[in-house]
From Swiss-Prot:
Its main location: membrane. To A.fulgidus AF1754. It is found in: Cell membrane. The chain crosses the membrane at residues 5-25, 62-82, 90-110. InterPro entries: Brnchd-chn_aa_trnsp_AzlD. This is Uncharacterized protein MJ1155.1. The lineage of its organism: Archaea, Methanobacteriati, Methanobacteriota, Methanomada group, Methanococci.
Length: 110
């Protein structure tokens, strides 16, 4: 399997689990309102920090190759524009993943 596709799958699964696990655990455990408030204070920024870490590690690779930075920038621009248009994070992520894949296939083959 292509390394890019494998990396995209891992990031997608990681992103899904970051959102699914807290909802799943909350529905399974009863009478946790006090604990949720305490945990929420700690975990409120966890998904943002994990996504940021995934983004930074995928955006900056050494040695820095211009085509990789260009592909990531193009994908990021499409993610921002699509989010501004539809206000839907899922659609913007899907569009940016598709654009990243297409741009990596097109720009690397040049």
């Amino acid at each position: 399997m292509d390394k890019n596709i494998l990396a995209i799958i891992f990031v997608a699964v990681g992103t899904y689990l970051i959102r699914y696990i807290p909802i799943h655990l909350h529905s399974k455990i009863k009478n946790i309102d006090e604990k949720v408030k305490e945990i929420n204070e700690i975990l409120i920024y966890s998904s943002t920090s994990v996504i940021s870490a995934l983004f930074i590690t995928s955006f900056i690779k050494f040695p820095i190759i211009f085509s990789n930075v260009l592909i990531s920038t193009i994908s990021l621009i499409f993610a921002i524009v699509s989010y501004k248009k539809w206000n839907n994070l899922g659609i913007s992520i899907l569009i940016s993943v598709v654009i990243y894949y297409l741009a990596s296939k097109f720009l690397i083959s040049i």
